Amino acid sequence: MIKLGIVMDPIANINIKKDSSFAMLLEAQRRGYELHYMEMGDLYLINGEARAHTRTLNVKQNYEEWFSFVGEQDLPLADLDVILMRKDPPFDTEFIYATYILERAEEKGTLIVNKPQSLRDCNEKLFTAWFSDLTPETLVTRNKAQLKAFWEKHSDIILKPLDGMGGASIFRVKEGDPNLGVIAETLTEHGTRYCMAQNYLPAIKDGDKRVLVVDGEPVPYCLARIPQGGETRGNLAAGGRGEPRPLTESDWKIARQIGPTLKEKGLIFVGLDIIGDRLTEINVTSPTCIREIEAEFPVSITGMLMDAIEARLQQ
């Protein structure tokens, strides 16, 4: 029997209709895996050994009562075959410390999804720089004068922090906007933090597409998140409307170009954000949208993921 651990935010607080981690747990349980539930505070390191207080978990598709704990134990993480790191951002120093603990288990043979080193290496905004032929025009800087020059060149730009999620602190600055200075100061904290600027993509009106990639293979359907009511951001967390769709030719091209790098880096479950035919983000920490896509199309993304995990465990 495969022992699967999951590190996640409190399961009591999730919305099971939309929660991708919950979908993964349902599929793992369907396959007869033993489920071990952990929150960040359950992980610890003693004399170099990664351990955790885990609770054995049962899950069910029931909106009143979707989980129950059926046991608890303290064990070496290396006793688990696979651990899903599904803690939501912020990607802060605490998150990084957790990846070091998980890495100690990985060295003993536990498969960590996604690979701890790659979680540290691949910032969701900055990792796109390795695929700059696929992205919008992009500037990463602390320098207000450079941001101003970029804005003057493109006259309509998006500014965002490198560590936000769910559309937090994303600004659109159009031609003639008097607020560029204060936005630049806010995002860079007066020149002490990097931020990202990209030219505005009018295709956002048709949606910001979340394309999922499982062990290098694109899922054939995506979720387009469409901004509502004059909003620039499509993120569901910012009120966007989700619309599942088949991938377009350009979606396939982007996903296939990036897929081999993701696989090689042990990034087994990744969400690409694509606007029009441009790649804007590579989400590696805790990508979502599984349930919305599976509800609309005949595809089991969690099945693809567990197949990929089982294939890696047999290697």
UniProtKB/Swiss-Prot annotation:
Gene Ontology molecular function terms on file: ATP binding; glutathione synthase activity; metal ion binding
Limits of the ATP-grasp domain: 125-310
InterPro entries named in the record: ATP-grasp (IPR011761), ATP_grasp_subdomain_1 (IPR013815), Glut_synth_pro (IPR006284), GSHS_ATP-bd (IPR004218), GSHS_N (IPR004215), PreATP-grasp_dom_sf (IPR016185)
Major enzyme class: ligase
Known cofactor(s): Mg(2+); Mn(2+)
GO cellular component, one term: cytoplasm
Associated pathway: Sulfur metabolism; glutathione biosynthesis; glutathione from L-cysteine and L-glutamate: step 2/2
Source organism, top-level taxon: Bacteria
EC number: 6.3.2.3
Cofactor notes: Binds 1 Mg(2+) or Mn(2+) ion per subunit.
Reactions this protein catalyses: gamma-L-glutamyl-L-cysteine + glycine + ATP = glutathione + ADP + phosphate + H(+)
Residues noted as binding Mg(2+) in the record, renumbered to the chain: 281, 283
UniProt keyword terms in alphabetical order: ATP-binding, Glutathione biosynthesis, Ligase, Magnesium, Manganese, Metal-binding, Nucleotide-binding
PROSITE patterns documented for this protein: ATP_GRASP
Annotated SUPFAM superfamilies: Glutathione synthetase ATP-binding domain-like, PreATP-grasp domain
Residues at which ATP binds: 151-207
Family: Belongs to the prokaryotic GSH synthase family.
Protein name (database record): Glutathione synthetase
Source organism (scientific name): Escherichia coli O157:H7
